[in-house]
Amino acid sequence: MPKLYTCLICGYKGLIQNPLNNDGEYQKTFDICPCCDFEYGYSEDHDVSLGFIVTPDYLIDAAIQLYRKQWIENGMKTANPEDIPEELRNGDCLKFEVLLKQLNSLNLDTENFEIKGFNGY
């Protein structure tokens, strides 16, 4: 089985290519996460609006955060449910407790999220 990499958006370990290069910087692999449907090299430019046609490198983190927020607030629908183990999802959507575990694996401060469903927001 090939090594799988963790998605920077949802924390699911299902990417074929590492979204970070050897220096730990974001790279456009055009790999698509089977969980959140983020396409590295496309979604940061076309699925979020930061006021640019092509998102500048210094705003990649903002694009990732915005995509994550949109995906969570839209119900955490999995892109390819057949590729996500059944125990991790509720129908076609990721279970909330699974999302929390995956986000914690990214060392995200979920206590500081301003996202519907988090911290009374």
From Swiss-Prot:
Protein's recorded name: Uncharacterized protein YozI
Record organism: Bacillus subtilis (strain 168)
